[in-house]
A protein has these predicted regions:
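A structural signal for short, well-ordered beta-strand elements
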Residues: 51, 65, 87-88, 277, ...
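Residue-level signal for inorganic ion chemistry
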Residues: 58, 79, 90, 94, ...
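Rossmann-like NAD(P) dinucleotide-binding subdomain of oxidoreductase/dehydrogenase enzymes
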Residues: 148-283, 407
Length: 415
């Protein structure tokens, strides 16, 4: 073998992050989790269960109990009872609790990162270097705002009991976005994690007790869409904060109509990435990589629609194809991996079927490598030769699929 050939064949060696500490923690909890209600972990022997699986291996991580209506009622009542005293604690008192949570999350950041990757399938580099540090910073940040409340935000009032429902693409980060500001302003919480990714929420629930959060201030329930809908419609809730699909958001809006609840809905998207003929194409390609192939494309604001001026479309497409061939698709715990698994077999099948059905309406597909159905690995994908009416241009795919179309003028791109 020549020296040149050796360099051409160079590749990353496998560099797996150890998951022993995370597995030991799951074992210490008998791989089963119930609900956190009024400061206590509640389990029911004959509860209906959800299997939380590692999407890259189908390994069982834990059994998750689905909350029943009585447990939901108890969680809401506990939050209602705890709210007045939590509000009266004042901004400085609440800031102490938020700082305590932030420090504990920071202390356990490594195990949280591994649990997030095991449960979600995202690369450990993203969990370790982006998601978890950002989640921690949200608690530090809002602790600072809590300290300023009485002086700078005295005209603002707490809402009361807030129902919070999050998706599976950024489990702990979404939790922090919801919980930290609500706590800072004196609200109490009934939180529901996504049924696919509840593990880090359960770890956080244990940290709540360790941090000394008063009973009832943070209640956490598990379950599927049925219990989520019941939580959103509950008359004892003053506000619903939901992040997820557009269809579920529409359903929540209907169920809460006429109740006088405050409502925050962060729903799906189909963001456009526009490249003009005078752009730096190499820089544009790197922007595209971060925009659509970050987190396997499972991002509501992913730049999944590429609009490129016709004069440079061919050149840009070639550069994209060369670049995505360099992306590493593989084991999520490998520190050399760029794209991990899609979150579940259901999501893998959904993306695969959407792409196949979409191609029936035309378009050319390029994939950097073969599809690995066993590990739910869907390769970085580029689809070209489509127009604005194409289903893959109109519908959110929520996977590592970039759909490209051309334009001639700026006004045409905007339209």
């Amino acid at each position: 073998m020549t020296l040149l050939k050796s360099f051409e064949d160079l590749d990353y060696s496998e560099a797996l992050e150890s998951n022993k500490e995370a597995q030991d923690w799951l074992e210490s909890n008998n791989r089963r989790f119930g609900q956190l209600i009024n400061g206590k972990f509640v389990t029911v022997k004959n509860a209906k269960l959800i299997e939380s699986l590692n999407p890259s291996t189908s390994e069982l991580l834990a059994h998750i109990e689905i909350a029943n209506s009585e447990q939901l009622e108890s969680a809401v009542k506990s939050a209602r009872k705890a709210q007045p005293s939590w509000e009266k604690l004042g901004g400085h008192g609440r800031a102490k609790a938020l700082y305590a949570l932030a420090r504990l999350m920071q202390k356990h950041a490594r195990i949280i990162s591994v649990l997030e990757t095991l449960d979600n399938g995202k690369p450990i580099r993203e969990s370790r270097d982006i998601d978890i540090p950002l989640a921690i910073r949200h608690f530090y940040h809002h602790a600072g705002w809590a300290q300023l409340q009485e002086k700078d935000f005295s005209s603002y009032q707490s809402i009361g009991v807030v129902a919070q429902i999050v998706p599976w693409n950024f489990p702990l980060l979404m939790l922090s976005w919801k919980i930290a500001p609500a706590l800072a302003m004196g609200n109490t919480i009934v939180f529901k994690a996504a049924e696919q990714t509840p593990i880090t929420a359960m770890f956080f629930a244990q940290l709540c007790n360790e941090a000394g959060i008063p009973p009832g201030v943070i209640n956490m329930i598990n379950g599927d869409g049925v219990i989520g809908a019941e939580l959103a419609a509950h008359k004892g809730v003053d506000k619903v904060a939901f992040t997820g699909s557009t269809a579920v958001g529409q359903s929540i809006r209907k169920s809460t109509a006429g109740q006088g609840k405050k409502l925050t809905l962060e729903l799906g998207g189909k963001s456009a990435f526009i490249v003009f003929e005078d752009a730096d194409l190499d820089a544009a390609v790197e922007g595209l990589v971060d925009s659509i192939w970050f987190n396997q494309g499972e991002v509501c604001c992913a730049g999944s629609r590429l609009l490129v001026q016709a004069e440079v479309a061919k050149e840009l497409h070639l550069k994209i194809k060369r670049r995505i061939k360099q992306l590493r698709l593989g084991k999520p715990l490998d520190k050399s991996t760029d794209l991990g698994s899609l979150v579940s077999k259901t999501q893998f099948n959904r993306v695969s079927e959407m792409v196949q059905e979409g191609l029936n309406h035309g378009g050319e597909i390029y994939q950097a490598c073969d599809i690995d159905e066993k590990g739910n690995y869907y390769p970085p994908t580029l689809i070209t030769d489509v127009d604005s009416s194409h289903p893959l241009v109109q519908e959110e795919i929520f996977g590592p699929v970039l759909v490209s179309m051309t334009f001639r003028t700026q006004s045409e791109a905007v339209e």
